[in-house]
Design a protein with these regions (language model features):
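Glycine-enriched, solvent-exposed interface loops adjoining structured elements
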Residues: 1-249
Length: 249
C-alpha cells in the first residue's frame, strides 16, 4: 500500500475545542461552550508568552533613528526584544555595518547625567508597556494622547546625532495571535498542536462540572506535551562560552 503523500494536517478552532471537550469527558453543545473555550485558549497563549521564547513568534524590525530624538515606539504586540544592533550606512554594500548596542535597565538609564547628549547610540532602555488601548479622554500619561495606545518603547543613548544615518535593527518576540472564529487556524506551528490541545483540555476541566477526576491526568499530559514541544522549539546552533578576562594595571 502507498502512503497518503500529504503532510498538511492541521486543525481549526472548532476541531481543537471539540477534541479538548472529549478529553474532559464532555461534549461541545452550546455557543457558550465555544465562547468559554476560545477565552481559555487566549489565556493559554498569554501563559505561553511567560514560559520563554516561542521561536515562531520572532520577527525582525527596523526603526530609522532621527537626530535629536531618543524615544521610539515599537509594534503594539511586542512582548520583548531578544537582539538588537545599530546599523550605519544602511543599504551601502561597502559601508553598512551593524554595531553593538547594549540593553540597560531603567535604573541605569535614570542615572545618566545628560540624556540629551548626542552621538552614536550605544545603549538602549526597553520600556515594556502593556500595549493596551485606553479611551483617549482618560488615557494615562504614558499612553499616546492621540490613539490611547500604551505601546512598548525604546529609548537610546546617546541621542542620535547628525554625523551619519542610524537604524535600530531588532529581533522581537510578538504576541501569539488570538484564537479568532471557528474557521480560523491557529498562529502556532503544527508541532505545537498536541500541546495546544492538551493545554485547552486541562483549562476546560477546571471549569466543567464532573471533570474534576480527570484534572491530574490532564495536567500531567499538558506538562509532558509542553516539555516535548519546548525542548524541540529552541535554537539549535552551536554555542561557545569563553571566560571574560579583565586586567588591572
Amino acid at each position: 500500500m502507498t502512503t497518503s503523500g500529504l503532510s498538511d494536517f492541521n486543525l481549526d478552532l472548532s476541531e481543537i475545542i471539540e477534541e479538548a471537550f472529549e478529553r474532559c469527558g464532555a461534549e461541545l453543545r452550546t455557543g457558550y461552550d465555544h465562547r468559554t473555550a476560545r477565552r481559555s485558549l487566549n489565556l493559554l497563549f498569554a501563559d505561553w508568552a511567560n514560559r520563554g521564547i516561542n521561536m515562531w513568534t520572532i520577527e525582525q524590525g527596523t526603526i530609522n533613528l532621527v537626530q535629536g530624538t531618543n524615544t521610539y515606539v515599537l509594534p503594539v504586540d511586542t512582548v520583548d526584544l531578544i537582539e538588537h544592533v545599530v546599523r550605519t550606512g544602511a543599504g551601502n554594500q561597502t559601508t553598512q555595518a551593524d554595531l553593538t548596542i547594549t540593553r540597560i535597565s531603567v535604573d541605569t538609564y535614570a542615572t545618566i547625567p545628560n540624556k540629551l547628549s548626542q552621538g552614536r547610540p550605544i545603549q538602549v532602555w526597553i520600556n515594556r508597556q502593556s500595549g493596551a488601548t485606553y479611551p483617549t479622554a482618560t488615557a494615562p500619561s504614558y499612553a499616546n494622547s492621540t490613539t490611547g495606545v500604551d505601546a512598548p518603547q525604546i529609548t537610546v543613548w546617546p541621542t542620535p546625532d547628525g554625523s551619519q544615518s542610524y537604524q535600530f535593527v531588532y529581533w522581537r518576540l510578538r504576541r501569539i495571535q488570538d484564537a479568532g472564529t471557528g474557521v480560523n487556524t491557529f498562529d502556532v506551528p503544527f508541532r505545537m498542536i498536541p500541546c495546544l490541545t492538551a493545554g485547552l483540555a486541562y483549562y476546560l476541566a477546571l471549569k466543567i462540572n464532573g471533570a474534576e477526576a480527570r484534572l491530574p491526568i490532564l495536567k500531567q499530559q499538558y506538562d509532558e506535551a509542553w516539555e516535548l514541544a519546548a525542548t524541540e522549539d529552541r535554537e539549535k546552533a552551536a554555542q561557545r562560552f569563553v571566560p571574560r578576562r579583565m586586567f588591572i594595571t
